Every structure is written in C-alpha cells, then in structure tokens.
Curated annotation (Swiss-Prot):
This is Transcriptional regulator SutA. Residues 59-83, 92-105 have a biased composition (Basic and acidic residues). The lineage of its organism: Bacteria, Pseudomonadati, Pseudomonadota, Gammaproteobacteria, Pseudomonadales. Disruption phenotype: Deletion mutant forms smaller biofilms, and produces more pyocyanine and less phenazine-1-carboxylic acid (PCA) than the wild-type. Affects expression of many genes and impacts fitness in fluctuating conditions. It comes from Pseudomonas aeruginosa (strain UCBPP-PA14). The gene is sutA. NCBIfam families: trans_reg_SutA (NF041490). Causes widespread changes in gene expression, and plays a direct role in the regulation of genes encoding ribosomal components. Associates with chromosomal DNA through interaction with RNA polymerase. Contributes to biofilm formation and secondary metabolite production. Important during transitions to and from the survival state. Keywords: Stress response, Transcription, Transcription regulation.
Amino acid sequence: MSEEELEQDELDGADEDDGEELAAADDGEADSSDGDEAPAPGKKAKAAVVEEELPSVEAKQKERDALAKAMEEFLSRGGKVQEIEPNVVADPPKKPDSKYGSRPI
C-alpha cells in the first residue's frame, strides 16, 4: 500500500471514531435529561428504582414453569432427589492468609 492509501485509511478510521464518540455523547445527554424527569431523591425515588429491577409476576411464573418442567424431565429419566442436612456446606471456609511481615524491609 502506498503512503497516501495509509493516510486515507487513518483518516477514515478517525472519522469513524468521532462518530462513535458523538453517539456516546448523545447517549450521555439522554441519560442526564432522564435524571431531570425523575422525582426528587427520597424514599419514593429509591422504591421506584427497586421496582424496576424486580422481574414481573409473569416472568417469575415462566421461570417456575420452566423449573418444574426441567424437574419432571430429570425425574422421568431416573434422576433422584437427595435431601441433605441443613448444616452441611459445600466448601469449608478458607483459613485466612496472614501477610503481615511477609515482605522484607
């Protein structure tokens, strides 16, 4: 490739990067304008945020149905359900590593 083609490629790449930065800036402006429409900070604002993060009742029911179907298939293939004691944990806690004094002065 000639130097002119390389320079043109660099210029084209710079133009694309500018477009992405502008799009990101537009997104940032949209986010800041959304904050203006939100109610004043307080308990109601926090409650609204929590409600948005929770899945809907229909979504929960779909997950329950999918889990029930998967359990039925597992049991129909000969799978068994084992009940374990409540005080049994998968991994014992790790012994804390003391790094005090491990580095030379």
